[in-house]
Amino acid sequence: MRHRCRVPQLGKAADQRKALLRSLTTELIRHGQIKTTKTRAKAVRSEVERMITLAKDGSLSARRRAIGYLYDKQLVHALFAEAPERYSNRKGGYTRIVRTLRRRGDNAEMAIIELM
């Protein structure tokens, strides 16, 4: 029984789910916005916010944690250079989820998640 479990399962095993969230986080930070299902967008939101908060901290240990999570080391350096001035006046809420039309093949709820 999964009482009070906060992580959405996304229909995948734990290792596949973690890899999916890592790749979605990496691509969202790289491109600024991605189109995915609404459930995946809600799941990746917390991971992206965690990475941006680490980048705002800017310490060496925070940089190493981000390098261990994101797939692109150069992207981490760019994030740590950009995030402190871009999000200096925000304490959270770095992303926005906008609902779009349902996917044609399976009628899944789609959304665009973007960085503010």
Curated annotation (Swiss-Prot):
GO terms for biological process: translation. Transmembrane segments: none annotated. Keywords: Ribonucleoprotein, Ribosomal protein. GO terms for cellular component: cytosolic large ribosomal subunit. GO terms for molecular function: structural constituent of ribosome. It holds the Pfam family Ribosomal_L17. Gene3D superfamilies: Ribosomal protein L17. Part of the 50S ribosomal subunit. Contacts protein L32. HAMAP family: Ribosomal_bL17 (MF_01368). Belongs to the bacterial ribosomal protein bL17 family. This is Large ribosomal subunit protein bL17. It comes from Crocosphaera subtropica (strain ATCC 51142 / BH68) (Cyanothece sp. (strain ATCC 51142)).
